[in-house]
Structures are given as C-alpha cells and as structure tokens.
Curated annotation (Swiss-Prot):
Lineage: Bacteria, Pseudomonadati, Chlamydiota, Chlamydiia, Chlamydiales
N-terminal signal peptide: 1-22
Subunit organization: Part of a disulfide cross-linked outer membrane complex (COMC) composed of the major outer membrane porin, the small cysteine-rich protein (OmcA) and the large cysteine-rich periplasmic protein (OmcB).
Task performed by this protein: In elementary bodies (EBs, the infectious stage, which is able to survive outside the host cell) provides the structural integrity of the outer envelope through disulfide cross-links with the small cysteine-rich protein and the large cysteine-rich periplasmic protein. It has been described in publications as the Sarkosyl-insoluble COMC (Chlamydia outer membrane complex), and serves as the functional equivalent of peptidoglycan.
GO cellular component, one term: cell outer membrane
Gene Ontology MF term list: porin activity; structural molecule activity
Name of the gene: ompA
Keywords from the UniProt entry: Cell outer membrane, Disulfide bond, Ion transport, Membrane, Porin, Signal, Transmembrane, Transmembrane beta strand, Transport
Name of the protein: Major outer membrane porin
Family, as annotated: Belongs to the chlamydial porin (CP) (TC 1.B.2) family.
Protein localization: Cell outer membrane
Length: 402
C-alpha cells in the first residue's frame, strides 16, 4: 500500500508539472515540515508533553509567494434581457426609425451565457504564517496582482447606433438617440494595472499515519486593480483607451451624455475591477526523505466585478474633416453615398458606440492540484504546484522558519 501511494503521488507531481494549468491548495503537511528554526531551535510539537509551554507551541514562518494563473475558466454574469436600446433595424433600405424610443420589454442579452476566451491573473507577495503545535497554520500574504482578460465583443455588450438620419455627428438630435445594434463579431481585451492584493487562510493536518498526511485548507483573497488599457476591435468600431473612465449606476443608462467619449465628459468613474475569491481544499501528501509530493482537490469561487461600468468610444467634441471618430462607412449594396438633402450623412456610420464591462465569475468550481515540497535541514522549504480543470495555473512558495 505504501509503495502504491508513493508511486501515485510521484507520478502526479512530475507528470502534471509538464502541463501547467487562483489560489494554491498547498502541501497539507506544510505546518509540520519545518520543525527547526534558523534563529530559534525548534521545540516539541506535542501538546500532550507535560513539559511543553505555549511558547513552544507557537512558531513563525516567512517567505515568498508567487501564483500565476494562465487561463481561469470564467463566464459573464448578466441578466437574460438587456434594456434601454432602440428596436433593431429590419427594413431593407432607408433609415432606422424610432431610434429615440427604447424597446418596451428590452431584448435578449447578447452577453448572456458568454464565456471568457482568456483570463490571466498573476500575483507576487510576501508570505507570513503563524504555526501552532506544528499542526496548524494561520497565514496571510501581502503583495501585488495584475490581470488580462479577453472575449468576444458580445460578452461586453458592444453597442451603437446605425441608420440614423442627421446632418452632422454633432447634431442636436443625436443626444436623444439610443443605440439600436449589438456588435457580436469583434474582440474586447483589457489589461489591469499592478495593484495591491492580500489574502488570508488557514491550513491544518487532519490525519497522519507514518509518512502520509491528510490536510485541509481555507483561503480568501482580494484585490482592486484598475483597467490600464482597453482594446476594442470590430469592423464597425475600433478603438484603444489608456486608463479608461466610464459611467456607473443610473448615469450609465441610455442615452449617454453627448459629451461621452470626449475630453469634456463629466461624472465619469475609473474602471476598477473588484476581485474576490474564496477556496476550500483537501490534499494528501507522503514524505520521501527531503521530498514531499502531494495531490489535492479544491472548491473555489472567484468574481471580477467592475460595477457594469459603461465606457464610450473616444471621439472629438466637434467635427474635423466631417468626422468625430475613425469608424468606417458601411455602404452595403448602394453605389453612392446617402444624401437625402444632406440629412443622411451619418446613416452608414456607427454612432455613440460604447461597451459595458460585465461581471465575470467562475464557470467551473472544482479543480485538482498536484505539487511537491523540497525541504532542507527542516528549516527551509520550496514548494511547486500545478492546478488543472477550473484553471491552468502554477504556484511557487519559498519559506523559512524563524
């Protein structure tokens, strides 16, 4: 049985390291691995020892914590209906009508059920653990995190107005109009800045038998980075914004202010993403001299919430060479530019385009973690871990006992 357990743990730790897949499970035997200190000699970890004191029961470890999520499995969390837009144009020719009147019952939300194509999250932090009786850890991390997210434009409700009849892109009628089309054939991606992050957790050995240890852990992590660069790519509208700002709450309702996207926009907020994650895990390890491989499972939930901020496409306040954006003309099957006495100059150009950063959350809750810890003189340790299924991630932890 012992040989079978050794073989299984070694195979999992080495095989999965070749295929790396947000929070690490960690080695379940970690609280009892470092039993001697670099500054103070370790004492008995047996609470039944009559000579033991509370000073002997407590020790402190510190080190480096690095966690790198290469692909978190996320989906957008939105309602099934989307309100505030005008009716979708259906006529073969001419202009869109009633673009200043919202649809009575809204329309199906094009973002509903959409998955993120890519979600990355990287953290580097200092690690500090309070150990009790060489069996239980209470730990925290303090550091910095940054992320990258990418999906189709449908997942972020890229919308605009097409077929609107007006004499100029600064027409007095434009502020009263509503977007009437959702752009699904496009890509939205954004990078966050590097922001302060922290986490707290506890880990303990529940059962020990010889060199085998079964343990459990709980963690909670949080960070609030801002979007550093937003990139929107589609045929009707394409733009890049550095440090974007937008509208939240009631001010994000359609129609947006006519100054939205210009340098004179007011009442805008920074695009801050609120990251929260909690996790519980269970793992089994087996010590082989200096090497302690382990395998575990976790259940986690992560959310990335930007308060559904709506960000308008950048544009000029007034026309230069008859344009305010770089959006192309979409002539369709016509052979001449629309005119209609000068009123249709905007009918073939997407106007008042904007996107909404929807809330994102975990699509898969369960995951598997495999890893190994290398120990030196019972004072220092280095841990490497890979995680699969609900994310593809790698973790590294180096620590020492005082």
């Amino acid at each position: 049985m012992k040989k079978l357990l050794k073989s299984a743990l070694l195979f999992a730790a080495t095989g999965s390291a070749l295929s790396l897949q947000a929070l690490p499970v960690g080695n379940p035997a970690e609280p009892s691995l470092l039993i001697d200190g670099t500054m103070w000699e370790g004492a008995s970890g047996d609470p039944c020892d009559p000579c033991a004191t509370w000073c002997d029961a407590i020790s402190i470890r510190a080190g480096y914590y690095g966690d790198y999520v290469f692909d978190r499995v996320l989906k957008v969390d939105v309602n099934k209906t989307f309100s505030g837009m005008a009716a979708t144009p259906t006529q073969a020719t001419g202009n869109a009508s009633n673009t200043n009147q919202p649809e009575a019952n809204g329309r199906p939300n094009i973002a509903y059920g959409r998955h993120m194509q890519d979600a990355e999250w990287f953290s580097n932090a200092a690690f500090l653990a309070l150990n009790i009786w060489d069996r239980f850890d209470i730990f925290c991390t303090l550091g910095a995190s940054n992320g990258y997210f990418k999906s189709s434009s449908a997942a972020f409700n890229l919308v605009g107005l097409i077929g609107f009849s007006a004499t100029s892109s600064t027409s007095t009628e434009l502020p009263m109009q509503l977007p009437n089309v959702g752009i699904t054939q496009g890509v939205v991606e954004f990078y966050t800045d590097t922001s302060f992050s922290w986490s707290v957790g506890a880990r303990g050995a529940l059962w020990e038998c010889g060199c085998a240890t079964l343990g459990a852990e709980f963690q909670y992590a949080q960070s609030n980075p801002k979007i550093e660069v937003l990139n929107v790519t589609s045929s009707p509208a394409q733009f890049v914004i550095h440090k974007p700002r937008g509208y939240k709450g009631a001010s994000s309702n359609f129609p947006l202010p006519i100054t939205a996207g210009t340098t004179e926009a007011t009442d805008t907020k920074s695009a801050t993403i609120k990251y929260h994650e909690w996790q519980v895990g269970l793992a089994l390890s087996y010590r082989l001299n200096m090497l302690v491989p382990y395998i575990g499972v976790n259940w986690s939930r992560a959310t990335f919430d930007a308060d559904t901020i709506r960000i308008a496409q950048p544009k000029l306040k007034s026309e230069i060479l008859n344009i305010t954006t770089w959006n192309p003309s979409l002539l369709g099957s016509t052979t001449t530019l629309p005119n209609n006495g000068g009123k249709d100059v905007l009918s073939d150009v997407l106007q008042i385009a904007s996107i909404q950063i929807n809330k994102m959350k975990s699509r898969k809750a369960c995951g598997v973690a495999v890893g190994a810890t290398l120990i030196d003189a019972d004072k220092w340790s280095i841990t490497g871990e890979a995680r699969l299924i609900n994310e593809r991630a790698a973790h590294m932890n180096a620590q020492f006992r005082f």
